[in-house]
Structure formats: C-alpha cells, structure tokens
C-alpha cells in the first residue's frame, strides 16, 4: 500500500509524492490527538448557553478556531507520514486546491492510516 499525494510547488508545477510504509503507531497517534482536540472543544461547548431547542449557541469565531486547529493538525499529520522532507504542512497547505484538500487529506487519513474501506462507508450510507 503506497500513499500518494500530489502537490503544486511555488513554480506551479505538480509533483506526486509516495510513501510506501506507514507504521501502525501513526494510526494510534492520530486517534489520540484527534480525540484530544475534539474533547477540548466538547468541554468548551458544554459550558455555552443553549437555544430554545437545547442546542449550544456556539460563537462563530470559536467554531472556526476549532476547525482551523483540526485542519492544521490533519495537514501536519499527513505531512509527517512522508519520509520526503519536501512534504511539509506548509507544502500541503500551499500546494493543494481548497476544493480538493479536505477530501484528499481525509482520504489518506481514513483509508490509508485508519484502514477504513470505502465499501464500509457505502454500506452505512442511508439508501
């Protein structure tokens, strides 16, 4: 199983990077760190006032901070999967289209690192 990541460099040229091996420890590291980020956010949300439906009223800035923290963590995590030092968090953030970045990063994490299969998601999707 090789992980593939296509990035655009500062000259506008594309380069595809491959990583042949990812240790199981990376899976565990991802699960732990994402849980810590999410738990921190959930603790914050529990302290917020709620609306008439009992849903927390989350300030936009706070939610955006959470999304940014999670997105930066995921970009850094994917960069650290690669042995090639050219693959960095900044290279990922600067070398991918916004419309593709989230899907590409999450595909690497979900399928290559965590081991989910696309068929698993298809079975869970409502029909």
Predicted regions located by residue number:
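C-terminal charged interaction modules
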Residues: 79-127
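Short N-terminal mixed-charge amphipathic segments
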Residues: 1-68
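Alpha-helical structural motif
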Residues: 20, 73-74, 101
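Detector for Asparagine
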Residues: 9, 52-53, 72, 80, ...
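Alpha-helix-centered segments that form part of catalytic cores
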Residues: 67-77
């Amino acid at each position: 199983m090789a992980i593939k990541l296509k990035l655009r460099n500062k000259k506008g040229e594309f380069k595809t990077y491959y990583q042949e091996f990812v240790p199981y420890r990376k899976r565990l590291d991802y699960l732990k760190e994402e849980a810590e980020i999410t738990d921190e956010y959930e603790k914050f949300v529990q302290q917020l006032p709620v609306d008439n439906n009992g849903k927390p009223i989350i300030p936009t800035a706070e939610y955006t901070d959470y999304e940014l923290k999670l997105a930066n963590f995921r970009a850094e995590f994917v960069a650290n999967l690669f042995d090639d030092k050219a693959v960095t968090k900044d290279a990922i953030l600067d070398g991918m289209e916004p419309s593709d970045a989230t899907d590409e990063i999450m595909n690497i994490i979900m399928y290559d690192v965590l081991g989910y299969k696309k068929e698993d998601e298809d079975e869970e999707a409502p029909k």
